[in-house]
């Protein structure tokens, strides 16, 4: 049983999590984030810690940003987009139990201060920005680093705020 409570978007996500790991979960039930849901998440955050595991889509990223502002020491897990897509739908409920376990094995806490280790020059140098296949390359490298997919700006932010080291980055890019 995981100590932390996993925060997901919906009840189908909770059912899929149960197939992967033994953990308590809270569903946000969309991005309106009702007060009662926020209160439940706050109690879990203060008593046990939370892991934010939202869908790898625009709505999921929006929910993640809102939750991160409210709960700055939350841990983050990311299922890669290509591992969360089935039946013309994207979401945690589409991910395999193995993909979920892999995501939960690579947790990150967002730092309020940027490491400034990486710049756009690094992204361009490694074909992660400014190239026709940059989005695909970011998805692959994001999956290897456990930081998920993001556009160039989001990806750079995650590199600098999720404790990614230069060595880990270089290893992911070169493998």
What are these model-predicted stretches?
Residues 2-3, 27-32:
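Short, flexible loop segments at the rims of nucleotide/cofactor-binding pockets, characterized by
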Residues 1-5, 48-51:
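Short active-site oxyanion
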Residues 1-3, 15, 37-40:
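Phosphate-handling DNA/RNA-contact segment within nucleic-acid enzymes
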Residues 8, 28, 58:
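Short glycine/serine/threonine-biased micro-segments
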């Amino acid at each position: 049983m995981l100590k932390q409570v996993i925060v997901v978007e919906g009840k189908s996500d909770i059912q899929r999590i149960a197939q992967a790991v033994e953990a308590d979960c809270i569903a946000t039930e969309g991005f309106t984030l009702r007060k009662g849901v926020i209160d439940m998440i706050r109690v879990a955050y203060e008593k046990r810690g939370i892991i934010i595991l939202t869908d790898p889509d625009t709505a999921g990223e929006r929910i993640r940003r809102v939750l991160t502002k409210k709960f700055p020491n939350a841990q983050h897990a990311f299922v890669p987009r290509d591992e969360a897509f089935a039946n013309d739908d994207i979401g945690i409920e589409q991910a395999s139990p193995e993909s979920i376990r892999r995501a939960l094995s690579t947790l990150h806490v967002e730092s309020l201060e940027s490491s400034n280790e990486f710049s756009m020059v690094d992204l361009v140098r490694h074909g992660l920005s400014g190239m026709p296949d940059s989005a695909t390359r970011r998805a692959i490298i994001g999956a290897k680093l456990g930081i998920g997919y993001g556009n160039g700006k989001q990806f750079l932010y995650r590199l600098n705020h999720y404790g990614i080291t230069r060595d880990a980055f270089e290893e992911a890019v070169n493998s």
